[in-house]
């Protein structure tokens, strides 16, 4: 399993959620993230960013590393926006939809926490941190 595959499966699962219809879901590894988030915030006043997963091995003594992949899903909104569907709402929906979600070929996602932060004068975000037990093979293998 490659970390990008986990990220793409999470993005696909969120894109299919009816309650998040119309909310752009951005995958961090797919090009210029800063401008894509700014464009989404400018057009839709909110978006969801699926960040690049991290990985903490519990064993790397073999050709396949076993451990925990950590993924952060950020629900971002304009601070001045009073429209229905705040970043907090989106984060709670994402946590609910993704917690215990089986990810084919990987395992089951588990929600670890939700936190908030102000990104700048115009935007704030709620981050949902998820983990999944998985193994990483050789990234050069197809």
Language model features with spans:
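Charged, amphipathic alpha-helical segments and their flanking helix caps
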Residues: 1-30, 35-142
């Amino acid at each position: 399993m490659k970390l990008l595959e986990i990220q793409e499966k999470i993005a696909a699962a969120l894109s299919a959620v009816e309650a998040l219809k119309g909310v752009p879901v951005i995958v961090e590894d797919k090009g210029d993230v800063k401008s894509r988030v700014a464009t989404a915030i400018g057009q839709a006043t909110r978006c969801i960013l699926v960040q690049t997963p991290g990985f903490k091995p519990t064993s790397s003594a073999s050709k396949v590393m076993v451990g925990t992949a950590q993924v952060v899903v950020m629900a971002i909104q304009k601070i001045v926006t009073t429209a229905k569907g705040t970043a907090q709402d989106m984060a709670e929906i994402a946590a609910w939809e993704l917690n215990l979600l089986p990810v084919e070929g990987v395992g089951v996602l588990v929600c670890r926490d939700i936190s908030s932060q102000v990104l700048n004068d115009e935007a704030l975000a709620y981050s949902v941190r998820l983990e999944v037990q998985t193994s990483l093979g050789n990234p050069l293998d197809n």
